[in-house]
A protein has these predicted regions:
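Conserved ABC ATPase signature
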Residues: 132-136, 140
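Helix-to-loop junction immediately C-terminal to a conserved catalytic motif
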Residues: 49
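A short, flexible loop at the N-terminus of ABC-type nucleotide-binding domains that lies
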Residues: 1-4, 8-20, 68-70, 109
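The feature captures the beta-strand-to-loop junction immediately N-terminal to the Walker
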Residues: 34-36
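Conserved ABC ATPase "signature" region
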Residues: 110-128
């Protein structure tokens, strides 16, 4: 379960990106946050994964508060696909980019290869594993980023863009 209590965040003293935001997402529940450009949707996503820290309020995963001390533990439970998937590509090909998170979690190579093929296939990118990310369309990049997150089998997946679905 995710619980957000009275969250505030500002990029400047005059301009609140978020003010007094509270919500709860139970296990197996989906939450969609909709709004105009600049309404704080990406800010909420970044707060939920600990990229930004709340200036007021709190975020809990089950009974664990997201803090500097717990952020690494919680990040292992949460995956995010950003609005611009280019920010998630680190390698020379699609296969490497799907594998990146798995390598960080020390998944054995034999298991990693199976997961790469399984999730690339699930998103229709199995024929693109050796392609360079910069040669892909925006939608293909989204699918590669989603495959990488799904392969991690996280408890929570945050899609910071309507077209990430």
């Amino acid at each position: 379960m995710i619980r957000v209590n009275d969250l505030d965040y500002s990029y400047s003293q005059q301009d609140h990106a978020l003010k007094g935001i509270s919500f709860e997402v139970k296990d197996q529940e989906w939450l969609s946050i909709l709004g105009h450009n600049g309404s704080g949707k990406s800010t909420i996503s970044k707060l939920l994964v600990g990229i930004l820290a709340p200036q007021k309020g709190s975020i809990y995963y089950d009974d664990i508060e997201l803090t500097e001390k717990t952020v690494d533990k919680i990040r292992n439970r949460v995956g995010i696909v950003f609005q611009n998937p280019d920010n998630q590509f680190v390698g020379v090909n699609v296969k490497y980019d799907i594998a990146f998170g798995l390598e960080n979690r020390c998944v054995p190579r034999s298991e990693m290869q199976k997961l790469i093929v399984e999730y690339a296939t699930k998103v229709g990118m199995q024929d693109y594993l050796l392609r360079e990310p910069q040669t892909l369309s925006g939608g293909q990049k989204q699918r590669v980023a989603i495959a990488g997150i799904l392969a991690l089998n996280t408890d929570v997946i945050i899609l910071d863009e309507a077209t990430s679905m």
